[in-house]
């Protein structure tokens, strides 16, 4: 997906003109990014490329990828217009030597497939912890200006009451629950990052990101669709949406472009050692209600929501993640898209 797509271009324009981001700090600088082939990484990298071609910002982008050919294919349109984007072949457990100066780091690579949390928990937690420490060591050796670690709302764990979750709220995670290998790993990396800030004065910040709404490719082409992708796929094909749980968990959501502006704002701020929630507080609702809302307002009630519960532990237990983004708003950020508009935009992106 690139700027020939109207919605995608609008998002790029919004990001590069967000006046609360200190964009000038990125001019003629080098930024190292992990996780560029995921949704957030793709949008982030594309926005930097777009900034370069629109305003000649000369931001050099070094992207760590496991498969260069796959990355080149995914970013083929961006590579045609900007020679500041380059790929480094490697993974988090084996980062190759990098001779270039690095000014900024955004670490977004992480396992995100729920099935892996149950089937390969050792590999998941090792990848999260060991890989992230390798990135922190790279940041330390390069004497960077700033780093952002992309964490998750899942670190808050199993909240059974609907209290507002602030960055200093207790994390309710259970080491006896194998699926918690993911949020436990993310939480430990948060602690390791804070330790690097305390002991080595490494300028790192952490973002706990809500359920993100967005797409980077046509959902028809995705084999193993996640919940948001499945909703869009079903609307496009006029198929009923089938939930494997009752959908009772409640959470906040966030549109992809608002995630990117949060990342860049925090990356280029002068405060470090901080944790920020990234959420559109007005979107807080149950999964069940959210889907019904989308069916009514985006699918025009042409499809139904069906519940077919599966006896499995690959999904989180019912919980309530009501994130507050007050702290992030206090440094200038604000969300720009409400829940229904998020889905309308994603739906429009996929219409042939």
Where are these regions (language model features)?
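Active-site helix of classical SDR
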Residues: 181, 185-188
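NAD(P)H-binding glycine-rich loop region in Rossmannoid oxidoreductase-like domains
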Residues: 89-127
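N-terminal Rossmann/SDR dinucleotide-binding element
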Residues: 1-104
